[in-house]
From Swiss-Prot:
HAMAP family per record: Salvage_MtnX (MF_01680)
GO molecular function terms attached to this record: 2-hydroxy-3-keto-5-methylthiopentenyl-1-phosphate phosphatase activity
Protein family membership: Belongs to the HAD-like hydrolase superfamily. MtnX family.
InterPro entries, alphabetized: HAD-like_hydrolase_phosphatase, HAD-like_sf, HAD-SF_hydro_IB_MtnX, HAD_hydro_PyrdxlP_Pase-like, HAD_sf
Record-linked NCBIfam families: DKMTPPase-SF (TIGR01489), HAD-SF-IB (TIGR01488), PRK09552.1 (NF007103), salvage_mtnX (TIGR03333)
Statement: the UniProt record of this protein carries the keyword Amino-acid biosynthesis: yes
Protein known as: 2-hydroxy-3-keto-5-methylthiopentenyl-1-phosphate phosphatase
Transmembrane spans: none
Pfam families: HAD (PF12710)
Keyword terms of this UniProt record: Amino-acid biosynthesis, Hydrolase, Methionine biosynthesis
Domain of life: Bacteria
Organism listed in the record: Bacillus velezensis (strain DSM 23117 / BGSC 10A6 / LMG 26770 / FZB42)
Reaction(s) catalysed (UniProt annotation): 2-hydroxy-5-methylsulfanyl-3-oxopent-1-enyl phosphate + H2O = 1,2-dihydroxy-5-(methylsulfanyl)pent-1-en-3-one + phosphate
One GO process term, biological-process aspect: L-methionine salvage from methylthioadenosine
Amino acid sequence: MTRTPLIICDFDGTVTMNDNIVSMMKEFAPPEWLELKDGVLSKSISIQEGVGRMFGLLPSSLKEELTGFILKDAKIRDGFLDFVSFVRSNGLPFYIVSGGMDFFVHPLLEGIVEKERIFCNHASFDNEHIHIDWPHACDGDCTNQCGCCKPSVIRKLSDQQKFLIMIGDSVTDVEAAKLSDMCFARDYLLTECKELGLRHLPFQDFHEVKTGIENIGEVQAWLQKKNAGANLPR
């Protein structure tokens, strides 16, 4: 059976060069955010709790400043635009699943990735301090309080007929990487993939990811079958 590739891609630190939440906190948050960040990285507090409390340190009145800062500070990783063209032209199912917030994820991806292919958290600026809503929280099979739960999103999008490809970099990507058939990893996630013995390839830019995906046997088989079907006489 030829399985259909399904590509799930992180955003912060993967599509972008830096982690946008960390950049934002360094610029605007009081020192208390550092303890929360360390708690998330050490897994002593959940991602949902840590990130929610970090944003709770910021007054909602900063919305315009925060948005302007990220749109100016964030840099898209080399090769991403070509990579999106590659998956689109080949009909490869591709989704962004991000622990980031809609107020910066959507503007940064506008004109590149359709909104219906983006899963992320929602930041509310209605109260004195920023409040985070979690529209893609953990399902009944996950108790990790992930925030935007990548395994739960994957379970909605995937099944046994899918060949799951994960692209990521951080602690928020580890559980999704465990579900993947192939993981493209960098930074923290690369170390975790090595320690857990997961099938993976390192990457620094999306040119490497594109080449790596093109060389996966399962992807080649699916593309051959798809193209053969497209060339059948009607």
